[in-house]
């Protein structure tokens, strides 16, 4: 049987098409998912400082299917500290995208040439960086400890982070350096990513109380939020940073819940820290289901222990996830903040309180009365939409 013959022109055209397809696929630089695990899931825990995001990050980090990093964009702000938050948005977004794709070369611009795992910000809170293939401190399925991991794993080669990242079905990043949702639209519509956003919010009055305990540690970031061209801001008596944080939460929530773009459907989840404190396992099951994870018995025991400690935790533990009474933590501001400050926060953050479902107090008596529930029921129908473009009180 005679086979059909093709002209050299046709063959060249076919070869060029084949080459073009190959170049396109390679240029996307989409790493394959771990064998047998299906499409990789990317999760961004989007929050602000002192809102319980480190705790939520640990809920993901300790899961055996998750590669987790805490605030990788810290390195962007550390290197470009004279910039403002809006000016740094694109650099932060580009770094986040690269890390989601397990491309750790993106840190070349922000870290020393010779680097170890310990050069990553808060590296030891990542269970994935304390277990194989990075380190042998913990078996891959075990709950990790920052204190144990640090001395054993600090000098491990940085390149192992990329190898570890590529071996997990889920990549989860916690970040506090986005102040609107629109900057993330390119990631949400990126075919290389399968992105879910967990938007964690907390009562602004509780946030203020926690910020006051950690003022020095937040001074540089405060300056970037306020656009001070590199000047650190420790004292903030007019609560300008809290005001901006509240406005950003309103912008993000409105964009996601009020006429969202089609590509955001089923990819955004608003979580209030107070709901998590009241009923940890229910909220965590919902979060895991949203992100395609299962709750193991070992994780369930750890979550119970970490949320049923005694008291709100010591001040020296402000940036650590330790065993505490989660409900006590969420209510601590009602015992400690002067009512004058609470009233000021309510003036500045009225839109956020209304939108996110927090009830205002109108006297010190109401503030101290813990039988008065300040948390409104969850669900869009419970919230009256407040506009982030409304005129804010002068600060």
Swiss-Prot record:
Keyword annotations from UniProtKB, A to Z: Carbohydrate metabolism, Glycoprotein, Golgi apparatus, Membrane, Signal-anchor, Transferase, Transmembrane, Transmembrane helix
Segments traversing the membrane: 8-26
EC number assigned by the record: 2.8.2.-
GO cellular component term of the entry, any: Golgi membrane
Cytoplasmic side: 1-7
Gene Ontology process terms (BP): carbohydrate metabolic process; keratan sulfate proteoglycan biosynthetic process; N-acetylglucosamine metabolic process; sulfur compound metabolic process
Compartments reported by the entry: Golgi apparatus membrane
Lumenal side: 27-395
Signal peptide location: none
Binding, 3'-phosphoadenylyl sulfate: 49-55, 202-210
Tissue and organ distribution: Expressed in cornea.
Sequence similarity: Belongs to the sulfotransferase 1 family. Gal/GlcNAc/GalNAc subfamily.
Protein name: Carbohydrate sulfotransferase 5
């Amino acid at each position: 049987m005679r086979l059909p013959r093709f002209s050299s022109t046709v063959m060249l055209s076919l070869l060029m098409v084949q080459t073009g397809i190959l170049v396109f696929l390679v240029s996307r630089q989409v790493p394959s998912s771990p064998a047998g695990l299906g499409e990789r899931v990317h999760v961004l825990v989007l929050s602000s400082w002192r809102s319980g995001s480190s705790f939520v990050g640990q809920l993901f980090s300790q899961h055996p299917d998750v590669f987790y990093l805490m605030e990788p964009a810290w390195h962007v702000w550390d290197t470009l500290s004279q910039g403002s938050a809006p000016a740094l948005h694109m650099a932060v977004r580009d770094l986040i995208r690269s890390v989601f794709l397990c491309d750790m070369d993106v840190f070349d611009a922000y870290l020393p040439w010779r680097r170890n795992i310990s050069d990553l910000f808060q590296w030891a809170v990542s269970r994935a960086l304390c277990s194989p293939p990075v380190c042998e401190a913990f078996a891959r399925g075990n709950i990790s400890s920052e204190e144990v991991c640090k001395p054993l794993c600090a000098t491990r080669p940085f390149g192992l982070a990329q190898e570890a990242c590529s071996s997990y079905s889920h990549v989860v990043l916690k970040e506090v350096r986005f102040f609107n949702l629109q900057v993330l639209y390119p990631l949400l519509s990126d075919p290389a990513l399968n992105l879910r956003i967990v938007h964690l919010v907390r009562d602004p009055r509780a946030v203020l109380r926690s910020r006051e305990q950690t003022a020095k540690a937040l001074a540089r970031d405060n300056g970037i939020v306020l656009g001070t061209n590199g000047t650190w801001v420790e004292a903030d008596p007019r609560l300008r940073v809290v005001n901006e944080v509240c406005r950003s939460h309103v912008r993000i929530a409105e964009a996601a819940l009020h006429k969202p773009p089609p590509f955001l459907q089923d990819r955004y989840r608003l979580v209030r820290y107070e709901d998590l404190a009241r009923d940890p396992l229910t909220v965590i099951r919902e979060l895991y289901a949203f992100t395609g994870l299962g709750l193991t018995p070992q994780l369930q025991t750890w979550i119970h222990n970490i949320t049923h400690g005694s008291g709100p935790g010591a001040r020296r533990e402000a940036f650590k996830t330790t065993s505490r009474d989660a409900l006590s933590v969420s209510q601590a501001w009602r015992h400690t903040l002067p009512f004058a400050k609470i009233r000021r926060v309510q003036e500045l953050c009225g839109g956020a309180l209304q939108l996110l479902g927090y009830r205002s107090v109108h006297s010190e008596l109401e503030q101290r009365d813990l039988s008065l529930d300040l948390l409104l029921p969850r669900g869009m129908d419970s919230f009256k939409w407040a506009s982030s473009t409304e005129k804010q009180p002068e600060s």
